[in-house]
A protein has these predicted regions:
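Acidic, Mg2+-coordinating catalytic module of metal-dependent nucleases/exonucleases
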Residues: 1-50
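Generic serine detector
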Residues: 1-2, 23, 33, 45, ...
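Acidic-enriched, low-complexity/disordered segments with a strong bias for Aspartate over Glutamate
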Residues: 10-13, 21, 48, 58-60, ...
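Residue-identity detector for threonine
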Residues: 17, 22, 67, 72, ...
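Residue-level signal for secondary-structure boundary elements
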Residues: 37-40, 51, 55, 169, ...
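Acidic catalytic cores of enzymes that act on phosphate-bearing nucleotides/polynucleotides
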Residues: 43-125
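Non-catalytic terminal regions of proteins
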Residues: 101-103, 111-181
Length: 181
């Protein structure tokens, strides 16, 4: 209701009822489609989970938000593989970490500890949850560690993943599968 109020259509005392929330969401979507049609098309393009894989696998790297502990953070990642247990869940490598240094570790036991240690080295994108995938050009817009790294290093890290994807995916899948046995 606060988003509606901020955009000039207060829902009044009916806020948080099914009818008012639906009406408010409808008006917000119309406003977004009018003011920023490209953003609107991008948002609804990933409603179909079949479109998600190509939007993350067919590019070298991309940006996506993730919310945890009530805080939304922006991540820049490169596609690794589908989750070995949960179909439609896609594992992506967080490019703030150096994949070449990490995967140079030959022992899967040591790699498992590194991958699962804090901070997380990979993230999960759920195709059926309408993820918001942004172009890589957004990577350096937030004044964070990705800005410090810059596009050149992000590109190098993404290329390492792409060139070695099959081997990296096999190792990560094996490590994750072992956790489910």
């Amino acid at each position: 209701s606060s988003l509606c109020r901020m955009n000039g259509f207060d829902l009044g005392d009916k806020a948080h009822t099914a009818e008012a929330d639906t009406s408010g969401m409808n008006r917000l979507m119309k406003l977004i489609s009018k003011k920023n049609p490209e953003l609107f098309k991008k948002c609804i393009s990933l409603n179909d989970k079949k479109n998600v894989l190509s939007s993350i696998k067919d590019v070298d790297y991309f940006c996506h938000p993730e919310t945890f502990f009530g805080r939304t953070r922006q991540f820049t990642s490169s596609y690794l593989c589908e989750h070995p247990v949960y179909k439609g869940y896609h594992l992506v490598f967080d490019l703030k970490h150096d994949p070449e240094a990490m995967f140079s570790e030959k022992s899967n036991e040591v790699l498992k500890k590194v991958l699962n240690g804090a901070p997380k080295k990979y993230r999960t994108i759920k195709a059926n949850k309408n993820p918001f995938i942004q172009d890589k050009s957004f990577a350096t817009n937030y004044g964070d560690e990705y800005t410090t790294l810059g596009h050149e290093i992000l590109e190098q890290r993404a290329n390492f993943i792409i060139e070695n994807r099959k081997e990296l995916a096999n190792r990560v899948s094996l490590i994750i599968s072992d956790q489910f046995e």
